Amino acid sequence: MYKRQYYHNLTSYLIAEGDGRGANYGVTFVSEVSNPVVYFNAFKKMSAKMFKESFGGEAYLLRQQHTGGGNVTHSVSVYFNSNAEALDFLANYMNTPQFAEFVQEAGTTFKSVRTYMEQALLQYNPD
């Protein structure tokens, strides 16, 4: 018998660090991930340590995309209280030891597809 997998959503939220309620600014990195287990573990370590940085953000979220235009499989979002904090993060995160460790562990398991910045104008039921 042929089984077809159905999803109630187009996205599964896999790993979250921090509390992004009320943080209306975000940066999202969309990727094609070839080895989710390695990528997930490296992301979990990096996101837990990134809060130590002054520009570390309020929350980190890793999603798996069930549908997504071509080669998109996962996305990571980092949330902030202001657009200035988001821009500070973008200017500095690549120079941190946390990001260097992430790239060393997961560097061959993902390819960047696109990155974008977002602003929530109104949150409905943020919890």
Predicted regions and their residues:
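Short S/T/G/P-rich N-terminal loop/turn motif that feeds into the first structured element of a domain
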Residues: 3-99, 107-127
